[in-house]
C-alpha cells in the first residue's frame, strides 16, 4: 500500500488516501526539487500489453480489446515527458508495445530507434533489462534476445529477486516461448 500525500504550507505532509500498486496512474511529474512520482506503476496496463503481445505472437492478429488497451496506453502516456532514464525506459516500454499492437510502423520505428540509441547510456540494470526485453518481444531480434539474457539470466541465481526482476524474468521466458526460442 502507498499513501497519497498532500504537502500543506511547506511544512507538513498529510495522507489523503491509501492506494495499491496498479490502482493509480502517473499524471505528471513534480519538476521542482525532489520528484514526488518516482515510478510508473500501472500493473493492469503493463500486464495487459504483455498478454496482448502473447496473443499477437500466437495468432498474428490483434483483438478489438487489445486495440482498445493499446489506444488507452497512448492516450495516457503518449504525451508524457520523463526527465530520467529510468522513467523514459518505463514509458517507452509501454509505448513500443502499444505501437506494435496498433501496427503504427512509423511511430514504432521512431521509438525503436530512440530506444536503441539509449542502450549505451542506460546504466541501471533493471531499466536496461526492461528496454532489452521489450525490444526483443516487439522485434524478435536475436541480438536483443542475447543482450536481454545477458542482463536477466544472472538474476535467476539470486535467492529472492525483487518483484520487478521476477517480472522481467517471466516476460523474457514468455517471449522465448511465444517466439519459439525456448528449445535453443
Q: What kind of feature is each model-predicted range?
A:
Residues 41-48, 66, 81, 88, ...:
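Residues that mark the junctions of alpha-helical repeat units in TPR/alpha-solenoid scaffolds
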Residues 7, 11, 47-54, 94, ...:
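"A position-specific structural signal for the A-helix of alpha-solenoid helical repeats
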Residues 145-158:
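TPR/TPR-like (Sel1-like) alpha-helical repeat modules
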Residues 157-184:
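Terminal, low-structured helical/coil segments at or just beyond the last alpha-helical repeat
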Residues 4, 87, 107, 127, ...:
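Structural signature of alpha-solenoid helical repeat junctions
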